[in-house]
Every structure is written in C-alpha cells, then in structure tokens.
Amino acid sequence: MIGLLHPGEMGAAVGRCLTSCGHTVLWASEGRSLATQDRAKAAELTDAGTIAAVAAQAGIILSVCPPHAATDMAWAVHGFRGLYVDANAISPGTAREVAQLITDTGGRYVDGGIIGLPPTAAGTTRLYLSGPDAEKVQALFEGTDLDTRIAGTALTSASAVKMAYGAWTKGTAALILAIRELAREEGVEETLLAEWALSQPKLEERSQGSARAATAKGWRWVAEMEEIAATMAAADLPDGFHQAAAEIFRRYPVPGRRDAARSSTSSLGADPGTPTG
C-alpha cells in the first residue's frame, strides 16, 4: 500500500492517478479540513486515520505538502522503514536533510519535484525523480496522467530541477508584480502599460495572471522562494533575487485571513493557472 501525505489539490490529484490504476492509497484524516476530506473521497483514497497508522501500513509514502512543512512531515513518520518519496518544492540541501532523517532509521529515500498543474489530464504535469529507487516510483505511475521522468544520477537531482524551474516561473512573477507596484506608486502605471502595449504586448496580461495566482497561492510560495534562495547560495550564486521574491509573496494574505500582511498588488485580479510549477 501507498501512503499519501497529504491530499491537497496537488496531492489528491497525484493520489487519484495511483488509485485509477489499482493501487490502494492511504491518507490520514486526523486534523484535516472538510475540504481535504472531500478531495480524498473524490480521489478514492483510504482513510487510515492518523499519520502513524499510514506509516505502519504503507510500504511507500509520498509526501506532497507545502515546502515549509516538508521536514516536519519526515519527522512525523520518523522510524518508517519503507520507501519515502519527498515530492515537495525544497532545496537540494533540505532534501538531503529529509533523506538523512529517513535513512538513519532504515528507510529508503527518493527525491521528487512536481512541475505543472494538478494532473487531471495527460501531458500537463511532470514528476521528476532521482535516487537509487527512482525507477520503482516511476513504475507506479505507468499509464496515468502523471508523466514521471528520471532527473539525474545524484540523489537530489529532482529537487535541483524543481528549484531551477521555479526560480524562473515564480521568480519572474514576483518581479513583474514588483514592477507594476513601483509604477503605481510613482503614478506612471498607465504610461508603463501603454509602453508595454507597444513594445512588450504580452506583459500586461502576464502581470495580471501573476497577480491573480499570487492572490490565491502567494503565501504558499514564500517558503519555495526561500528554498530557491538557499539553493542559489549553496551554488555560490546571488540569493537576493529570490529572497526579494519571497518578500513580494509574503505580502499576499492567506485567503480568508484578515490579519495577514497587506497585498499591495492583489488588485490586479486572478488566474489560478499562472504560473505553474
């Protein structure tokens, strides 16, 4: 059996890929919201009740959660001796820490990185994998809507691909949001938009899509930008680009939370499909 922690929008869709080809996929309902329970039911996941029960019954655990929770998730199953797949947006350095937690107690580790939207149709989403057992995980998804690919020979190659990809997609989204806000504060936004229409005709539309995506999910991207910054620093590259991107996304409130930081750019609107990965 396969354990899935947890069935958020991405996790539930990944779980559905597994159940659609006959795998039993366990999840833990304890402490989870009604929305999560509904997603798990729609994906035909089997409720084991607690994370401990998932770890006791599953031979493989797939972790799909926000990057700030990746290490905590590994601690939650500390002592698990099966195959642990971390498919979160974390730096190679964090991935090595998670791998150490798992392998220190006899488990095996596969690194993963998901690029694209939740896999509900073929060709939309890739799961990059690396590590000695990567091909075993790849085989689980054969024939499903999730395209799995081996990223490289190093243990954390998959995380490196995810960091490099997100550095562009979400990093440039943060940059264009900052540019729009700068122009607005200086009173030249309409002039800038007119110039974009002449020389960069796709930028206004992109900035609107980036703002809408950030309004919905920007708070989740703060930790990812910090992980990318750490990846850059570890490679002796400037990390300031993505530290700044983290600060931009930090200004977007968790939806429904009134006491969150002000989002100066959220007036631009919403497009949950931009950016992806």
Regions found by a protein language model. Give the residues of each.
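Helical "substrate-binding/catalytic lid" subdomain
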Residues: 160-259
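NAD(P)+-binding Rossmann beta1-loop-alpha1 motif at the extreme N-terminus of oxidoreductases
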Residues: 1-56
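Rossmann-fold NAD(P) dinucleotide-binding segment
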Residues: 53-108
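Short, well-ordered alpha-helix to beta-strand connector turns
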Residues: 22, 57-58, 81, 124-125, ...
